[in-house]
Amino acid sequence: VYTGVDKTVKRAVPLKVIRRIRDLDLTLSPVLDYARDLFMFSFYTRGMAFVDMAYLKKKDLQNGVLVYRRQKTGQQLFIKWEKPMQEIVDKYDTSGTPYLLPIIRDMDTDARKQYKNAAHLVNDKLKKIGRQLGLAIPLTSYVARHAWASIAKSKNIPISVISEGMGHDSEATTRIYLAS
């Protein structure tokens, strides 16, 4: 039965497109700049899911290593902290919150609601960036995750390593990413 949704929608973009996204001058549109920054942060952190970025805490970063648990699987991941990640974090004021990124900003409002609203806003703005760049697929936060996996595979990184890096429960899940 065809549900109207194709199982594997092409979501990955090549490294040259990632570079175009990174290098786009968005100084005149802070909201597009913010969306791009979160997209790039995801890419730099092995395609970290938006929900995981939202709940990253400042205390998760210690001695040059970011340690967090995937919301979806509970798997603990370790990521070496790199300069481009720090540059994004430094751009935004998150004082008054325990969070590393400016996604959950108001400590008196439901965190899940804020994350959902931010995800919607960011994906809406990423689609706009994608249209600006003339991309054939809608640009969303998910594209960063798929792109990281595909680019890693193109660099001959073993699927087992890509799978572990993405916090997948099985290599079968990673293979679905790499097929799309």
Model-derived segments and spans:
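Active-site/catalytic core of tyrosine-dependent DNA strand-transfer enzymes
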Residues: 12-19, 82-136
